[in-house]
């Protein structure tokens, strides 16, 4: 599938346009921005920059660290002794941090020998809402990528998205833009301009969205397609705008809350279909939002401004 760049005006569009294969095709053409270190042999020691996606405690003092690098893709690394109080590496391996790593090859897991944070994005860990949003960003990349198969455009998109959330950009626009760009880079660009059943050009009216078919279905075809989800014209326009615009242009329009929720629901259904299971972070975010909404109601009630 031939992919366009992120569009003019976005922080991640200055990277070159690539032709990324669908993961289902299995063959990665040369010169596309994808890199597999196995092709050049395994060095004993190497340095790379990476974003920390997640980590897991091992034994009494160690941690398994999963990170994403622009040139080496997803890495599963051992950070020895990092949980000890005097460890110099601990503060440089926080989730979401952009870190420079020196890595030595190991028998089962490669070992982090040095770590120096380039950018830590502390705002992403300052509250549950931002924590959940950042967790969603890294979880989505984690689910879509494979070990040691890197993509510089995907890494650039990841860093730009975390930076936008840390800078308090509106999360709905940041996340929807990220989802559509990542889908494009992974070879799963949804079709919003032609019916995926009959290939006719989509008219300016309500349509259907079918996750299993990867795009919109016209009203005539939609009546006979199972699992077709009604898609309003307004939501279709928003999806098209996000897909073909750079970030600044995509984030500019004000979207009604009901339409914003519809767009989110359709993309979540598509992602769940592709990944064949639900993501964890959206459920966490919904719980946080419900708690915050309940707290706001309680405050209003205590102030005597509630109903009645």
Task: Kindly give the residue locations of the regions a language model identified.
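Generic short N-terminal amphipathic or hydrophobic helices
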Residues: 16-17, 26-27
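Non-catalytic alpha-helical scaffolds and adjoining flexible linkers that form interface surfaces
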Residues: 32-308
